[in-house]
From Swiss-Prot:
Residues 126-146, 297-316, 344-361, 395-412, 453-468 have a biased composition (Low complexity). It comes from Homo sapiens (Human). This is TSC22 domain family protein 2. Residues 20-86, 126-158, 235-499, 587-607, 736-780 are annotated as: Disordered. May be involved in the loss of cell cycle regulation in colorectal tumors, expression is shown to be decreased in the majority of tumors. Reduces the level of nuclear PKM isoform M2 which results in repression of cyclin CCND1 transcription and reduced cell growth. Interacts with NRBP1. Interacts with PKM isoform M2; the interaction results in reduced nuclear levels of PKM isoform M2, leading to repression of cyclin CCND1 transcription and reduced cell growth. Interacts with WDR77. Residues 28-37 have a biased composition (Acidic residues). It comes from the Eukaryota. The gene is TSC22D2. GO terms for biological process: negative regulation of cell cycle; regulation of transcription by RNA polymerase II; response to osmotic stress. Residues 765-774 have a biased composition (Pro residues). Belongs to the TSC-22/Dip/Bun family. InterPro entries: TSC22/Bun (IPR000580), TSC22/BUN_CS (IPR047862), TSC22_domain_protein_2 (IPR053049). Residues 241-262, 415-434, 736-756 have a biased composition (Polar residues).
Length: 780
């Protein structure tokens, strides 16, 4: 089915080639290349596949991307993680997967794509809810918002991305039936636009993380992360939401680029965050706000919302001014996503991170600013913040709005140093965007961090991630904790894990601010944490484990997404792999539903699997498992995984499965380094596919040429015969004609029509002339 193009750079990617027969083509591309019949089966199957896919994905089909593939290829590149067809995720399946609990919406493809992201974010947000049960439910509504975010997604514009060309050749050529999808492969820069494949979407929730992961591996994704969030805010302000998502998207890219690797992760959690929003109520709000931070953009747009919601969660307010009421809450969530970004920030990304945020920030300004996290961003934030800050005011109190936002930021901060800066930034941003760090402190102060810490355990794990979860519990305590966090935070930020911790903090942040909110916050934190955790994880593999833990917590939270994320982190080392894994996992969940989609999904898994195959399974099981616990994912994952990998029979029908298998096999065989296998296997598969495609083209051309030649030969034959006939007639006429007539010919030609006879004669002469021409033709 779809192979992941191993090479990002190649312009030509075969998104999906399905073989009805088996995955043979997939497993052994070479074979299929050689064997036309196979191709044919493939074609048929692909058609079916496509169709189903289309149905599944609906429009997304187009986008369907190969995000996973991309991811694979991206490895370094993180080309396009972004995918997301938010809609897809909508499937719900995803959502479920993501946060099943959460709310299906979560599904949203958080995909890495920022655009998608946005939507996903939303979705994620949706899913996040799980974490805050309260939030969760709300989440659902939230998700709707998120969906809205999708619009931002447009950036992704999957549709434009692919063109499906159906070759129907009259001849019975085996290849004839194939359905080819040409996807323009955008380079990473297009990241945001990266096509997202529904599959991605599917994955996205989990993908989210994985994306993040993947991204982190790739780095690209980072940005995506948050976007969604904003969207999720949708409710709050759809606009804001939307904007945020957009922002997120846009911002995404930069971060992606920069921190690429991490970024993605952030994304993931972002997703998780979102759900919290629902809680806006206060607690919920907090949550959301927590998330918000991450999502600066979201926050921003939503921010207002956030503010509204936040009020309940002052902290939320912090970020955006969450003060606003709960409405903002939702927003807050968005903020959540931000954190993810921070993740990316984690690395150097910080700078870039800012970018990511930057976009959103604007929206965010208020609280989200914090998200801006990156210093650059932070400055940006600063500005925003300034703007925001005003709103922040409420926050100020909290920690200074800035602080509070910062807190949110913290989340991001947690993400990585970048994140931390982000967080700080956020915090700072609001407060002192310029100084991400300082903000960080703020965040610490936000206590968000503390929350994470509260988790205490988690902190260890993720530093904050888990904490976050705990955070909620200890929302209040978080506050106390924060200092540590703070202290740690700074360091944390330096350390990926730390950042993560921070991230968790983020959620806390809100908590801190709204101390009262705290509880909510805690929830938020929980969610956030997840996210962060994953982030952290991704950043630091080591955290990874914690992440897992975190994940579970998160899971509870509904971080499902996060789980995925954390999963990614887990992989982190494998980073991509794990991401894939994560994706896979989630995907898996989705897989069922999206088996077709899965196809794409599978890809990531494939790579995942490839390197991680074993790992994947276990890891997936493990890390994902927790997260997966979300039932949907879990079971799906299990089924998918097992199916995917093991399942053969399915292959036919489910390319994805086949793909998994094939890829899996290849990967296993190759199973060099994660990436090696991923890229290696992917490359091989892609090369094979390309070869196959070239052969196909060659054969088509050959047929066409032969047909043309035959036609031309026949025509020449006819012309020659006609020419000879005319010559004979001409000779006959000449012999019969009198000299007078012949002498008149020239004149007649000059003045034809003088006599019918002459005309006849004249007519004849031209014929003679013609013959020569004809001969020429024939000779030609």
């Amino acid at each position: 089915m779809s192979k992941m193009p191993a090479k990002k750079k190649s312009c030509f990617q075969i998104t999906s080639v399905t073989t009805a027969q088996v995955a043979t083509s997939i497993t052994e591309d070479t074979e299929s290349l050689d064997d036309p019949d196979e191709s044919r089966t493939e074609d048929v199957s692909s058609e079916i596949f496509d169709v189903s896919r289309a149905t599944d994905y609906g429009p997304e089909e187009v986008c369907e991307r190969s995000s996973s593939e991309e991811t694979l290829n991206n490895v370094g590149d993180a080309e396009t993680p972004g995918t997301v067809s938010p809609n897809l995720l909508l499937d719900g399946q995803l959502a479920a997967a993501a946060a099943a609990p959460a709310n299906g919406g979560g599904v949203v493809s958080a995909r890495s794509v920022s655009g998608a992201l946005a939507s996903t974010l939303a979705a994620a947000a949706t899913s996040a809810p799980a974490p805050g049960a309260p939030g969760g439910p709300q989440l659902a509504g939230s998700s709707a918002g998120p969906v809205t975010a999708a619009p931002s997604q447009p950036p992704t514009t999957c549709s434009s991305r692919f063109r499906v060309i159906k070759l129907d050749h009259g001849s019975g050529e085996p290849y004839r039936r194939g359905r080819w999808t040409c996807m323009e492969y955008y380079e990473r820069d297009s990241d945001s636009s990266v096509l997202t494949r529904s599959g991605d979407c599917i994955r996205h929730s989990s993908t989210f993380d994985q994306t993040a992961e993947r991204d982190s591996g790739l780095g690209a994704t980072g940005g995506s992360v948050v976007v969604v969030v904003a969207s999720m805010q949708g409710a709050h302000g759809p606009e804001s939401g939307t904007d945020s998502s957009l922002t997120a998207v846009s911002q995404l890219p930069p971060s992606e680029k920069m921190s690429q690797p991490t970024p993605a992760q952030p994304q993931s959690f972002s997703v998780g965050q979102p759900q919290p929003p629902p809680p806006p109520v206060g607690g919920a709000v907090a949550q959301s706000s927590a998330p918000l931070p991450p999502f600066p953009g979201a926050a921003t747009g939503p921010q207002p919302m956030m503010a509204a919601a936040q009020p309940s969660q002052p902290q939320g307010a912090g970020p955006g001014g969450q003060t606003l009421p709960p409405t903002n809450v939702t927003l807050a969530q968005p903020a959540m996503s931000l954190p993810p970004q921070p993740g990316p920030a984690v690395g150097a990304p910080a700078a870039q991170q800012p970018q990511q945020f930057a976009y959103p920030q604007p929206q965010i300004p208020p609280g989200h600013l914090l998200p801006v996290q990156p210093s650059g961003q932070s400055e940006y934030l600063q500005q925003h913040v300034a703007g925001l800050q005003p709103p922040s005011p409420a926050q100020p109190s909290s920690t200074g709005a800035a602080a509070s936002p910062a807190t949110a930021a913290t989340l991001p901060v947690g993400t990585g140093q970048n994140a931390s800066s982000v967080g700080a930034q956020l915090m700072g941003a609001s407060s002192q965007p310029s100084e991400a760090m300082a903000p960080r402190t703020g965040p610490a102060q936000g206590g968000q961090v503390a929350p994470c810490q509260p988790t205490g355990v988690p902190p260890a794990t993720v530093g904050g991630v888990v904490q976050p979860c705990l955070g909620p519990a200890g929302a209040g305590q978080p506050q106390s904790v924060p200092p540590p966090q703070m202290g740690g935070s700074g360091p944390l930020s330096a350390v990926p894990g730390g950042p993560h911790a921070v991230v968790p903090g983020v959620p806390n942040v809100p908590a801190a601010v709204p101390a009262p909110s705290v509880p909510s916050v805690s929830t938020t934190s929980v969610t956030m944490p997840n996210v962060p955790a994953p982030l952290a994880q991704s950043q630091q593999l080591s955290s990874h484990t914690p992440v897992s833990r975190s994940s579970s917590i998160i899971q509870h939270v509904g971080l499902p997404l996060a789980p995925g994320t954390h999963s990614a982190p887990t992989s982190l080392p494998q980073s991509d792999l794990s991401q894939f894994q994560t994706q896979t996992q989630p995907l898996v969940g989705q897989v069922d539903d999206t088996r077709r989609k899965s196809e794409p999904l599978p890809q990531p898994p494939l790579s995942l699997i490839a390197e991680n195959k074993p790992v994947v399974k276990p890891p997936v099981a493990d890390s994902l498992a927790n997260p997966l616990q979300l039932t949907p994912m879990n079971s799906l994952a299990t089924s998918v995984f097992s199916i995917a990998i093991p399942v053969d029979g399915d292959e036919d029908r489910n390319p994805s499965t086949a793909f998994y298998q094939a890829f899996h096999l290849n990967t296993l065989k190759e199973s060099k380094s994660l990436w090696d296998s991923a890229s290696g296997g992917g490359v091989v598969a892609i090369d094979n596919k390309i070869e196959q495609a070239m052969d196909l083209v060659k054969s088509h051309l050959m047929y066409a040429v032969r047909e043309e030649v035959e036609v031309l030969k026949e025509q020449i034959k006819e012309l020659v015969e006609r020419n000879s006939l005319l010559e004979r007639e001409n000779a006959l006429l000449k012999s019969l004609s009198s000299n007078d007539q012949l002498s008149q010919l020239p004149t007649q030609q000059a003045n034809p029509g003088s006599t019918s006879q002459q005309q006849a004669v004249i007519a004849q002469p031209p014929q003679p002339t013609q013959p020569p021409q004809q001969p020429n033709v024939s000779s030609a």
